[in-house]
Amino acid sequence: MIARKLGLLCFIGVALAFSQQLCAQVGETIPGPLLETRPENGTPIAASVQTNSIFSQPRGLTLSNSVVGGYNDNVNASTGASTSSTGGSGSLYTSDYASLSYTFGTPRTHVSLTTGGGVTYYFDRPEEGYNPAGYLGLSLTHKPSERMTLSLSVFASYQSQPDLSTNLGSNQQLGSFIHSTDTISLAYSWTPRFSTVTSYTLDLLNYFSSAGSLQNRMEHTFGEQFRYLLWPTTAGVAEYRYEIIDYESAPLDSTTHFLLAGLDHTFTPRLNGTFRGGVELRSSESNGFQASPYFQSALTYILHNGFVIWTNSYSIEESNTVGVSSAPAFRTGLTLNYGLTRRLSGNLALFYVYGGNQSGGTSSSSGNTIDISPSLRYLITRRLSANAGYHYTSVSGSQSQNNYFAGLSFSF
């Protein structure tokens, strides 16, 4: 009798551990932002859409408005090169943007919505003085049954400044563009140890200028994960993905098969990681057949007053340079939010890329891209805060930009 009870308790423990991992996947247990935004102009950091999916948002409605002033030393370099090489010049600017977040739900359904937008005015920009931007983020999870979880993630942004956190877009200033990433997935627990996750992701990139039109494309990714709970804190994963990339006009269409394996592991209640490795087999109009190793990892550490997210990947990426074919690239990103004191907090967003035809030219060319943005926020009152920071970008040593800013934010 005792042995039977112990066996039942062990079975329940394994089942609970497995269900907790599923909850973490749909973002129901850890508080945090749905996505990160740039404090100087309110534009979203696209890479945070996936990394922040483990977070949940406080229920209710939150509104905020920010007014920022700053100086950008290379605002007029439309070609993306440095000030000295292309005649680009600096400009004082001011930004005014607002954001709204709303979270609601039931025990079976959870919905989080965040949206925002604003305008940046450059005093010394000859033609385009006003620079509008806006974004929308939506996260929805629904459990039709105890075994099944349906998830939907929607992200779309309209902006003109390049977003170097992902490879969906140029690393040069090519005018206003729309970037969208939408994912729907179905997770089903067949047994207490075995589950599957079926997903579809649509990525869309559309520039409104003729200079950026060769980057316009749609990316369709179909995925199937087979998950097995090896231990209460570790799940083994076998994964297959099929990707179709369809360019609007450039002859760079491709199809790719991904054969991957990896682990999802909880090191401690505060530290968890995901790891994938394997091979990608690509057939493209420009390069023919390519076989390349693939690696992807993400570590999330929940601090007492914040969090750290570190991501890494090595894969074949679409080029950031107009009209240039794809090539392997290494990409790493670090996001840090930390409360230094009761009133003072610090943020850091760091992204680095090596390879991927960033410097243009032939398919073998490569370069280094770095994007770093530290900032501080000081809570003056419960609703009013001051922020200041610095944003630096450099692409292949030929393009650099320094952005200094400070402002006030009011939430209600």
Show the residue positions of the predicted features:
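Gram-negative and organellar
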Residues: 24-412
